[in-house]
Swiss-Prot record:
Species this protein is from: Actinobacillus pleuropneumoniae serotype 5b (strain L20)
Protein name, UniProt field: UDP-N-acetylglucosamine 1-carboxyvinyltransferase
Binding site for phosphoenolpyruvate: K22, N23
GO biological process: cell division; cell wall organization; peptidoglycan biosynthetic process; regulation of cell shape; UDP-N-acetylgalactosamine biosynthetic process
Coiled-coil stretches noted in the UniProt entry, renumbered to this chain: none
One cellular component term from this protein's GO annotations in UniProt: cytoplasm
Keyword Transcription regulation tagged: no
Amino acid sequence: MEKFRVHGPFTLSGTVDISGAKNAALPILFAAVLATEPVTLTNVPDLKDVDTTFKILRKLGVVVERDESGAVQIDASKIDHYVAPYELVKTMRASIWALAPLVARFHEGQVSLPGGCTIGARPVDMHISGLEKMGALIELDEGYVKATSNGRLHGARIYMDKVSVGATLSVMMAATLAEGTTTIENAAREPEIVDTALFLNAMGAKISGAGTDTITIEGVERLTGCQHRIVADRIETGTFLVAAAVSGGKITCRGTKADTLEAVIEKLREAGMEVTVTEDTITLDSKGQRPKAVNIRTMPHPGFPTDMQAQFTLLNVVAEGTSRITETIFENRFMHIPELNRMGAKGEIEGNTAICHGVEKLKSAEVMATDLRASISLVLAGCIASGETIVDRIYHIDRGYEHIEDKLRGIGAKIERFSTKFEE
């Protein structure tokens, strides 16, 4: 089991090059299954979940190659297998995105019920119901979701009972090759959906309205090859901005877009931080000041992102004042608070709300990561705590942060990865 050892405290300052967004790269990689010709993707992050996606695609018969520059070539022209198996899918819930492209292009597909972070219920029902409305026949058999269709799927009006990024992406992918027009109402509006639509349109799809709550897709008979650059990771950007805020530092995030992170930037300014933006950079200068407590309520985009909640929990436990953080997207997403409390934080959980009473300093401790975003908040807590902090179960962090210890060392952190052979 790998762990991080962090020797704090220190100020985090410098420049960070932001990686491509995992939450765009994964659906785009699966969407490449729709194309009859090779596609080339750049700015694809080097992450465990991306590697898992490569393995799933190869199981389907897709040729996947990453060259020395980091560009990824995908050739799905000779797919000969239509099952995404349990041994790969169990580690990553995003695997459900394999289903829609398979049934849209080949009229059959099977995906094991997915795994991933354990942060509450993440049902695949909305993915399934969307495909059913487009004419797919769905069976649940021995832990697999099986989808078949008698010829091409057909266009449909699909209203999302709940705003869902995953289901919006599934329906949008399937609709590109459907006969007729599909309308998705109450669609998710995240930047990663916009990026996936740009990729699909580059292959010849006819999608309009991505980034609004109504997306219209006019089906085409086939999709062809293209080149596409994955959008910058807004969550990684926000994470490094928080790193500067909690450590009294100044960090510039390079190769990113402020318009994908407006709610986070607004809250950082409310916390007393100076944030300046250019076309492709965001800089946070704390001026050595302790942040002020800010209330947070997670919401679908363009609201405050749930994937920044854990980082702002850390900000609030070291801020001046008391704050309330309400989580409306996922259940069970405050598992980092007991771990932060081991480091001297004063956090309480009341249902879907956390109450944070700010303290001036944290102290080192041994803590355990419970999910992807919780893990980075604990690593950053170690950066500002006095002494040596050990963060266990860091495999979570490798799922979503590219070369994280190298990037942290580049802005002043003392962090090392080490392995333990035995677990009690």
